[in-house]
């Protein structure tokens, strides 16, 4: 049995997309005393799954569940975040057959089994942005190493508009917060 989720500081985190997708793959889910009992009967079977919106968590869970499912799973309206691509690279290195990660349609051709591998997980862009924000609000300087610059392209102009200066060199980003942050338009 799995415990039902409770959400976080930002609010509730509904899992209906996850449960619906898992059901389409052959998972039978019953609620029992505040928990969920999940069974698969004859195993998981590939299917076409269309998400109502591109959820990162639901896309990841579908990828993980269908990688060893029998047949082909196609995820429509899949999340396109870098974390999806990284998970696909990892699973493919373990023997999976996943294509289309980073696009709105992902195709997973189920395999019988996965094997181990050595893999370096990509840099966490959310953690990097958190440290950048800390430097910005305190007027400090920070250098972040081993980042993926393209994953931060959308936030760098915002920091610049707020008065921060930054310098990219390879996979390192140095950012300096201003004495006083500028309002954003």
Question: What residues fall within each predicted segment?
Answer:
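Structural preference for solvent-exposed beta-strand-turn elements
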Residues: 1-185
């Amino acid at each position: 049995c799995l415990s039902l989720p409770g959400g976080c500081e930002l609010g509730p985190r509904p899992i209906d997309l996850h449960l619906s997708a898992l059901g389409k793959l052959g998972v039978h889910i019953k609620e029992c005393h505040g928990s969920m009992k999940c069974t698969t009967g004859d195993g998981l079977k590939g299917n076409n799954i269309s998400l109502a919106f591109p959820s990162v968590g639901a896309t990841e869970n579908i990828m993980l569940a269908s990688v060893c499912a029998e047949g082909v799973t196609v995820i429509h309206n899949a999340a396109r975040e870098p974390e999806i691509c990284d998970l696909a690279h990892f699973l493919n290195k373990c023997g999976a057959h996943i294509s289309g990660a980073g696009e709105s349609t992902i195709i997973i051709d189920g395999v019988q089994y996965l094997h181990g591998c050595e893999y370096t997980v990509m840099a966490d862009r959310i953690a990097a942005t958190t440290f950048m924000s800390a430097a910005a609000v305190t007027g400090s300087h920070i250098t972040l190493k081993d980042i993926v610059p393209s994953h931060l392209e959308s936030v760098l102009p915002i920091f610049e508009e707020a008065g921060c200066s930054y310098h990219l060199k390879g996979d390192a980003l140095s950012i300096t917060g201003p004495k006083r942050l500028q309002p954003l338009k």
